[in-house]
């Protein structure tokens, strides 16, 4: 395994944060903790239900970690939506992360997908059955156009995860494959469309801005994620078909060249995002900017991305990029480093155990006859 290109990563991260003029002021600390706990508490109770526990079959520690990661992403990035919308989106995106981390072959459960869909039957695939049950809770927040984007993008995501089960990075010379797969599993349209709940935006009035935002967000969101994920995925066996690694295979280039390709595309997308919306409806621009800054804060602060390891490694270095990166990291930590113990309680496993005990008690109650009830 090659050594991680720390200096290049620092330079790339600094350029990105400078391009978007990073300055996360989305919340006070009290507001952040309040929203985190509200979204987490509702989502935790959802996943503690017996049906979810039985059908997902996810290791409790992994489910807990996934839920905490997603709640952080949604609350930090969707700073303008209601707490109820945050909670429902947190549940939806936790389902997607659970699928992304799974290794089950979906083929057998997908044989009758369309027939079941057309007939209104429950899907054989347990993930689809649960996601479809929750979808109305998500879609109630959005107009029909945004809702269609959420549905379609979620279907694309499932297909992208299916492709990833084969650990196939593309054939050499297949230049379109890396971006094809990344668009498929990136949830860019789902994210881009879920920024515009109908209680804040009339999608008919803002149709052009929303459509453009979905188009721009598709690339910006996934490319930033790929850059910020590059460190954690660098030597992870599960993540060897990342966009950067697929660039190496399909374009037949070096790892440094692939990272530079991703860097240039991300920076260009960041420039576009700021330029396109800077003179549009102020509420639209504010929503996009809050998302961008919150999304970066989440990556810098969430343990899943391990960027604190980079910080610890370079904090005593005297290079310009190291100093700038550490300044940005500390800026993010000042607003976004909130210990899970302050908001992620109770644990899903604890809630599930309480439910299980209550179900046992209910089952053990004596059944009274109709005569006894009358007496």
From Swiss-Prot:
InterPro entries: Isoprenoid_synthase_dom_sf, TRI5_ascomyc, Trichodiene_synth. It holds the Pfam family TRI5. GO terms for biological process: sesquiterpenoid biosynthetic process. One of its GO terms (molecular function) is trichodiene synthase activity. Pathway: Sesquiterpene biosynthesis; trichothecene biosynthesis. It catalyses: (2E,6E)-farnesyl diphosphate = trichodiene + diphosphate. Its EC number is 4.2.3.6. The keyword Transmembrane does not apply. Keywords: Lyase. TS is a member of the terpene cyclase group of enzymes. It catalyzes the isomerization and cyclization of farnesyl pyro-phosphate to form trichodiene, the first cyclic intermediate in the biosynthetic pathway for trichothecenes. It serves to branch trichothecene biosynthesis from the isoprenoid pathway. Trichothecenes are sesquiterpenoid toxins that act by inhibiting protein biosynthesis. Belongs to the trichodiene synthase family. This is Trichodiene synthase. It comes from Gibberella zeae (strain ATCC MYA-4620 / CBS 123657 / FGSC 9075 / NRRL 31084 / PH-1) (Wheat head blight fungus).
């Amino acid at each position: 395994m090659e050594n991680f290109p720390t200096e290049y990563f620092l330079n790339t991260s600094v350029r990105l944060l400078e391009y978007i003029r990073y300055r996360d002021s989305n919340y006070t600390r009290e507001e952040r903790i309040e929203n985190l706990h509200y979204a987490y508490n509702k989502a935790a109770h959802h996943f503690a239900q017996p049906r979810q526990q039985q059908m997902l079959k996810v290791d409790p520690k992994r489910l807990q970690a996934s839920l905490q990661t997603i709640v952080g992403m949604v609350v930090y990035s969707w700073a303008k939506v209601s707490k109820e919308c945050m909670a429902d989106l947190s549940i939806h995106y936790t389902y997607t992360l659970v699928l992304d981390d799974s290794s089950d072959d979906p083929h057998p459960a997908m044989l009758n997908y369309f027939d079941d869909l057309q007939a209104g039957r429950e899907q054989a695939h347990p993930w689809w059955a649960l996601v479809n049950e929750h979808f109305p809770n998500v879609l109630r927040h959005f107009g029909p156009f945004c809702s269609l984007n959420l549905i379609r993008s979620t279907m694309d995501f499932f297909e992208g995860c299916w492709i990833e089960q084969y650990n196939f990075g593309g054939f050499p010379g297949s230049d379109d494959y890396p971006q094809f797969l990344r668009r498929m599993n990136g949830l860019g349209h789902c994210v881009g469309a879920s920024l515009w709940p109908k209680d804040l935006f009339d999608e008919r009035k803002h149709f052009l801005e929303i459509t453009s935002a979905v188009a721009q967000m598709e690339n910006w969101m996934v490319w930033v994620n790929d850059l910020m994920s590059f460190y954690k995925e660098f030597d992870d066996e599960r993540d060897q078909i990342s966009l950067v690694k697929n660039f190496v295979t399909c374009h037949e280039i070096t790892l440094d060249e692939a990272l530079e390709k991703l860097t240039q595309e991300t920076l260009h997308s960041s420039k576009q995002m700021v330029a396109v919306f800077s003179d549009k409806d102020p509420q639209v621009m504010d929503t996009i900017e809050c998302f961008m800054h919150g999304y970066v804060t989440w990556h810098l602060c969430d343990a899943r991305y391990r960027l604190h390891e980079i910080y610890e490694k370079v904090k005593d270095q005297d290079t310009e990029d190291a100093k700038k990166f550490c300044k940005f990291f500390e800026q993010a930590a000042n607003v976004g480093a909130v210990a899970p113990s302050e908001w992620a309680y109770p644990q899903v496993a604890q809630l599930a155990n309480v439910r299980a005990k209550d179900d046992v008690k209910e089952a053990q109650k004596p059944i009274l006859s109709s005569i006894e009830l009358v007496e």
